[in-house]
Amino acid sequence: MCLVRRDIFNARPEVDKCSTRHSVYKETIMILDALENADAYNALNSGFAKAFEFLRRDDLAELEEGRHDIDGERVYAMIVKAAGRETEVGELEAHEQYIDVQYVISGTDEMGWRPRSSCTQPQAEYNDEDDYQMFSDRPTAWVATEPGTFAIFFPNDPHIPLISAEQLHKAVVKVAVE
């Protein structure tokens, strides 16, 4: 399943009312797909090929929790093992410097999503140093992301990860915005 606008290569920033500063991503929305289809998205960012190569590692499930460098600060992964949270606990987060490629190794992550253009309840200004902004708005969609599938969240995609009734094991690859 792909949820991406096909005209992103000819982005028209004048049409979009979103606040992100990277116009090429202003007309995208989150992507959900199986890892076997990942190469179809490599043209969206030159770091995606390295991100997907990392996610295809035979030893991915055995990697230790924490940061794993792939291409320095440009592409790196965080391996996460965490108990899932309830939907009421999560808050929308958005990033501007990095795109999240969230891959589920085990468990089912019921990630929430809402377009940034409809977020009206920022908790604070964007934190440039840590690359995040939190919103109190509630998601407009929930997406069940199962093992072997990934979700890509662009700067326009506030999202709530780690929503599950079970233990989750994930790889979150951070890909620098171009």
Question: Model features per residue range: what roles?
Answer:
Residues 25-79, 89-94:
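A short, N-terminal "cap"/entry segment at the start of jelly-roll beta-barrel domains
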Residues 78-95, 105-119:
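Conserved short histidine dyad/triad with adjacent acidic residue
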Residues 72, 88-100, 118-122, 138-139:
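A short beta-loop-beta micro-motif enriched in histidine and acidic residues
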Residues 101, 150-152, 166-178:
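A short hydrophobic beta-strand segment most commonly corresponding to one strand
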Residues 97-109, 115-117, 125-131, 174:
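Short, conserved beta-strand element in jelly-roll/cupin
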Residues 6-29:
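Short, Lys/Arg-enriched N-terminal segments with co-localized hydrophobic residues
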Residues 143-158:
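Conserved metal-binding segment of the jelly-roll/cupin
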